[in-house]
Amino acid sequence: MAEEGAILKVTKDLRAAVSAILQGYGDGQGPVTDTSAELHRLCGCLELLLQFDQKEQKSFLGPRKDYWDFLCTALRRQRGNMEPIHFVRSQDKLKTPLGKGRAFIRFCLARGQLAEALQLCLLNSELTREWYGPRSPLLCPERQEDILDSLYALNGVAFELDLQQPDLDGAWPMFSESRCSSSTQTQGRRPRKNKDAPKKIPAAYGGPENVQIEDSHTSQAICLQDAPSGQQLAGLPRSQQQRHLPFFLEKKGESSRKHRYPQSMWEPEGKELQLDQEERAPWIEIFLGNSTPSTQGQGKGAMGTQKEVIGMEAEVTGVLLVAEGQRTTEGTHKKEAEWSHVQRLLMPSPRGAVEGAVSGSRQGSGGSSILGEPWVLQGHATKEDSTVENPQVQTEVTLVARREEQAEVSLQDEIKSLRLGLRKAEEQAQRQEQLLREQEGELQALREQLSRCQEERAELQAQLEQKQQEAERRDAMYQEELGGQRDLVQAMKRRVLELIQEKDRLWQRLQHLSSMAPECCVACSKIFGRFSRRYPCRLCGGLLCHACSMDYKKRDRCCPPCAQGREAQVT
């Protein structure tokens, strides 16, 4: 169990390191450099994988061999790309196999060849078994496939590394920064802030440059991070709402890009907000009118980005409605107080009381408008011939008009900042759409390659079937020839037996002749002298004298027994 846990930990750590690289630097977010903490973690996991359960092999009078020697041997046998090997060997400052292996890993990462090189090295399973023990993940087909899939995912990430590192024999290059933070490390943790240090807000967020806010403002800004999206600005004063609104929208846009919410959480696009009166918040209608066609014009491939833009618009609308309601309530209270003061000033004049009643009725109908005409000016426009005798009333009217103009200017600034945020969201949507089109092109190319591979497979399958049929025909023909050869062998065996039997008969006859006395004639038993002629019989080989060979029925050189036997056969 412990060994299995160690193997799983090696592969799990490698997948986690690859996931961290993809999360921090994938999708064109920037290249991986030597200062990246994720690179240090990935290189360590790769080295641990290549050294896990490696068999000890030593060269003659040399140092212990490491995974660098395994990579060199495997690539040389597979006749793969030897460019990384030549590059590492050209580095004279690297003396140990460990440093050369690290340089090989960094070069393959920078060139996008790590997964391909490792796959070539693992094709020869016998060589892999010679270098690694049975517990190595490189010998398990399932884990090997998982590792290669993870490494192939790194081909889409750019690595800008310094390949001329002379100190790889000692350790990997150190790092100093990280782009992705673990959720377990940052969950429930907030950055510490000095109570005496004021917070600075740049001019791009709707306020003047380097404006210092007091501690109460800082605490309110911190509380906004934990408040719901529709109530984040409700607890701030009006001036701080105007400052923090663009900054809040930008933060919400970033959070919406980081977290993919389902479509059911957003309000449907295309619905216009119907207010109670026509002149209430007209700038919201302009904002929605400008944003709706831009988001609807995106292609089908950017549907996810459109949902983000739609959700951000809905959140902006909710925040603006809350802010608008607060401004309307505050404006209504202020105007009621001012109007009561004006009425007290105009109490001696009955004409002023009538004008106050008329203007008060108009105030009730148009008090909810933010960008409408000032209610005091509307009251005085009904009667051109009416004049205000008290100069203090004119001063109050002028102050109210100036306040309305200032509110209108601040709202226009907010509209500009909102349009800027919407423009950024549209640019992001366009970039996402372009990236999606590129991915669709790559997918189409891969599909075409797959179709070609399938056609080649069909052709090879047909050729294989044809070869199998030819092999079957040849097998049948060879069986027939083998049967004929077997018959021939049987015939040859029978002939050999016949020849052996004939040889035995001849040998027995020869033995019979040798047993006879060679000093007398076979026919007349005449003893041969030193000068007697001897004639062998042509049938049995016996010796005959001259008289027997010439006189016996004129048969030359044939003994009487053989001559009688021949006559018997003829008759």
Curated annotation (Swiss-Prot):
Zinc finger map (FYVE-type): 474-567
Binding-site residues, Zn(2+) 2: 537, 540, 559, 562
Gene Ontology cellular component terms for the protein in this record: autophagosome; endolysosome
Location of the protein in the cell: Cytoplasmic vesicle, Autophagosome; Lysosome
CDD domains: FYVE_RUFY4
KW ATP-binding (keyword) present: no
Binding site for Zn(2+) 1: 521, 524, 545, 548
One GO molecular-function entry: dynactin binding
Domain called RUN: residue spans: 33-166
Record-level GO BP terms: autophagosome assembly; cellular response to interleukin-4; multivesicular body-lysosome fusion; positive regulation of bone resorption; positive regulation of exocytosis; positive regulation of macroautophagy; positive regulation of retrograde axon cargo transport
Major site of localization recorded for this protein: cytoplasm
Sections of the chain in a coiled coil: 408-481
Keywords for the protein's UniProt record, in alphabetical order: Autophagy, Coiled coil, Cytoplasmic vesicle, Lysosome, Metal-binding, Zinc, Zinc-finger
PROSITE patterns noted in UniProt: RUN, ZF_FYVE
Subunit composition and interactions: Forms homodimers (via coiled coil domain). Interacts with RAB7A. Forms a ternary complex with RAB7A and LAMP2; the interaction with RAB7A is mediated by RUFY4 (via RUN and coiled coil domains). Interacts with GTP-, but not GDP-bound ARL8A and ARL8B. Interacts with dynactin/DCTN1 and the dynein intermediate chain DYNC1I1/2.
PANTHER family hit by this protein: RUN AND FYVE DOMAIN-CONTAINING PROTEIN 4 (PTHR47732:SF1)
Function of the protein: ARL8 effector that promotes the coupling of endolysosomes to dynein-dynactin for retrograde transport along microtubules. Acts by binding both GTP-bound ARL8 and dynein-dynactin. In nonneuronal cells, promotes concentration of endolysosomes in the juxtanuclear area. In hippocampal neurons, drives retrograde transport of endolysosomes from the axon to the soma. Positive regulator of macroautophagy in dendritic cells. Increases autophagic flux, probably by stimulating both autophagosome formation and facilitating tethering with lysosomes.
Name of protein: RUN and FYVE domain-containing protein 4
Gene field: RUFY4
